[in-house]
Regions:
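Pyridoxal 5′-phosphate
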Residues: 1-170
């Protein structure tokens, strides 16, 4: 292969800056153990690096003072599955769109097909936009959550999340 041109940046960030490779190489050579696994030096140091990173990310994302509320996951799919499966309970209603990634559609459809949740997909227009009024009309008394992608990497549409968020708060 001559020159690699990587266009699937949603899957991962590649190539990474050299400083990232250098840090990871150094980290795995010095601290490549499970954090908090026991009291030996490398495990304690690894736990300190994880907690320090968690604190920095909590600050970056304006997460308040409790850095333990920030959860690390394998990737975006894992994160979305953790959130969706953690919120699902028998008898709830969920609102979403068919514009969502499979990491949203698959667990929602599975829970719907199993009879655990009632699921409403709101339509989108010919340009790929979801209209906030359609979200509002789909919400029921037992609606527990609404899942709408902010920006489609397929269509490039940016959904009006501020308006949708206000509707959800009502």
């Amino acid at each position: 292969m001559s020159k690699l041109i990587y266009l699937d940046n949603s899957a991962t960030s590649f190539p990474k800056p050299d400083v990232v490779y250098d840090f990871m190489n150094d980290f795995y050579r010095k601290h490549g153990v499970n954090p908090g696994r026991s009291g030996f030096d490398a495990a304690v140091e690894t736990e300190e690096v994880v907690n320090s990173t968690r604190k920095m990310l909590t600050k970056l994302f304006n997460g308040g003072n409790d850095h333990n509320r920030l959860t690390f996951s394998y990737n975006a799919t894992d994160s979305l599955n953790l959130i969706i499966n953690g919120l699902v309970e028998k008898g709830i209603h969920v609102v979403s769109t068919m514009l969502e990634h499979n990491s949203v559609l698959r667990p929602l459809n599975m829970h719907h097909q199993n009879g655990t949740i009632d699921l409403t997909y709101v339509p989108f227009d010919e340009h790929g936009y979801v209209h906030p009024d359609d979200i509002k009309n789909a919400i029921r008394p037992n609606t527990k959550f609404v899942v709408v992608t902010h920006c489609s990497n397929v269509l490039g549409t940016i959904q009006p999340l501020t308006e949708i968020g206000k509707i959800c708060k009502e």
